[in-house]
Swiss-Prot record:
Probably part of an operon that comprises bigR, blh, PD_1893 and PD_1892. Keywords: Cell membrane, Membrane, Transmembrane, Transmembrane helix, Transport. The chain crosses the membrane at residues 6-26, 45-64, 78-98, 99-119, 150-170, 175-195, 205-225, 239-259. The keyword Transport applies. This is Probable membrane transporter protein PD_1894. It comes from the Bacteria. It is a multi-pass membrane protein.
């Protein structure tokens, strides 16, 4: 491991942490492409397993910062995370059976669709009370969580770009609270994915630790910026959508090129 590669890996982790802190997701979207195309990991499944470690730890670290600022709706977040981990385990088990480049191609297509939906925006939802988690909301949150967890595990990602809109859909919480609350699920889904991939020796622990070092620093900066932008939910949605689409285009191009080569 050279100094240059160490700097590149830590810097890449910083970008991942910044995205997690700012958007409550996007970290895992950025992590796998960065590991493959910048850091130099050659096996897509090892890149996915390794990114899951860093994304999980960074998500939990950023969760603390968001919780300190009062952004987390704990009951909805806990229900979503607990139920979603069941889906994440099943999804990750299936994902490991699929060719890595085909998995990345599907992942890129999914990102593009979600990014376009985020750019379109959504109708303003009636605000739910912070202290009310009625039975209907719990059931709605749980059903969305298990589907989101399955998708997150299948693609080997934390799934923040799915979890944020899913939380808004299920609970009608404001965007900044969905961002903060999503981090519990991002961390939990990443942890389950990590353990599942590690059982098959598909995690590079050295690179993962370097990612974490950069990610914690970047996450702090992202959280500060998220607080400043909390009053402009539409801006957050559009920034989120643009990042997802940009990364999607690159992932689709690279994975398609590998498949047809």
């Amino acid at each position: 491991m050279t100094i240059q590669s160490l700097i590149v890996t830590i810097g890449s982790g910083g970008l991942v942490g910044f995205a997690l802190g700012l958007l409550g997701g996007g970290g895992s979207i950025l992590a796998t492409p960065l590991l493959l195309y910048v850091v130099g990991v050659t096996n897509p499944h090892i890149a996915i397993g390794t990114s899951a470690v860093a994304v999980s730890v960074n998500a939990y670290a950023n969760l603390i910062a968001h919780a300190w600022k009062g952004h987390v709706w704990w009951r909805s977040a806990v229900i979503f995370a607990l139920v979603g981990t069941l889906g994440a385990f099943l999804g990750s088990s299936i994902g490991m059976l699929i060719d890595g480049q085909r998995l990345l191609l599907l992942f890129g297509l999914l990102m593009a669709m979600v990014g376009l939906l985020m750019l379109r925006g959504r109708a303003t939802a009636p605000r739910a009370e912070h202290h009310q988690t009625v039975l209907r909301m719990c059931m709605k949150t749980s059903s969305v969580a298990i589907l989101t967890g399955a998708a997150s595990g299948f693609f080997g990602i934390g799934g923040g770009f799915l979890i944020v809109p899913a939380l808004i859909f299920a609970t009608r919480m404001p965007t900044i609270n969905a961002i903060g609350s999503s981090l519990l699920a991002v961390g939990s889904f990443g942890l389950i994915t990590t353990l599942n991939y590690a059982r098959h020796d598909l995690v590079n622990w050295t690179i993962a630790m370097e990612f974490i070092v950069g990610g914690i620093t970047g996450g702090g900066l992202g959280t500060l910026l998220a607080t400043r932008l909390s009053a402009s939910k539409h801006l957050l949605n559009r920034v989120f959508g643009l990042i997802v689409i940009a990364v999607a285009i690159y992932v689709i191009w690279r994975s398609w090129a590998s498949l047809v080569a």
